[in-house]
A protein has these predicted regions:
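Extracellular and select intracellular beta-sandwich modules with Ser/Thr-enriched
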Residues: 65-67, 77-83, 98, 166-168
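Long, low-complexity, Gly/Thr
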Residues: 46-47, 55, 84-85
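Extracellular ectodomain surface segments
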Residues: 1-33, 59, 79, 83, ...
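Extracellular/luminal low-complexity segments enriched in Ser/Thr/Pro
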Residues: 53-63, 154-166
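Low-complexity "stalk/linker" and mucin-like segments enriched in Ser/Thr/Pro/Ala/Gly
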Residues: 31-51, 132-152
Length: 169
């Protein structure tokens, strides 16, 4: 399955039984060999009597392999079955905080507007921030100045002299 798959493995059905014990009296437990990838709370058992289910959901932004062990007990004897869940890495989108809409007077600047960037897989120092203007007459690219470093960045927007209107930066 892919990292961050919303339904994990989906519903996996299995059947339990015992010659001496009614299926509804059997106990099913579970373990995960990699609790960082799949915490025990993310191995959810369901069903009743002989018809049982399990759903395995990896922790967010984790990938790798884990062995899930299901154990059935009648109170005296136990039996185990194992299966492997392989979680493939998925490139997550970088993040950027929202900057509120700005209203400024003609021939003034926004001043530095703070924002932060991040990415689960990429160090922030390796991320590139670019800029654009929907109205280059009002706000030419040269008048959009990026600053800061690491996760903490700023943008200062200075409209062209004697211009007014709206632009999306």
């Amino acid at each position: 399955i892919n990292e961050d798959a919303p339904t994990g493995t989906g519903l996996l059905a299995f059947t339990i039984g015992d010659v001496e014990t009614p299926a509804g009296s059997l106990t099913v437990t579970r373990t995960s060999s990699n609790l960082v990838l799949v915490p025990l709370a993310n191995v959810v058992l369901g069903g009743s009597d002989a018809s049982r289910t399990v759903i395995v959901t990896p922790a967010p932004n984790q990938f790798g392999s884990t062995t899930i062990t299901l154990t059935v007990s009648d109170g005296t004897n136990t039996v185990n079955t194992n299966f492997t869940v392989n979680v493939a890495s998925v490139n997550d989108d970088p993040t950027i905080t929202i900057i509120a809409d700005q209203i400024i007077n003609e021939n003034t600047t926004t001043g530095p507007l703070a924002f932060t960037i991040g990415d689960v897989e990429t160090p922030v120092g390796s991320l590139t921030v670019t800029r654009s203007s929907s109205n280059n007459t009002l706000v030419p690219l040269a008048n959009i100045v990026l600053g800061g470093s690491g996760a903490n960045r700023t943008v200062t927007v200075t409209p062209a002299a004697n211009q007014f209107g709206a632009a999306t930066i």
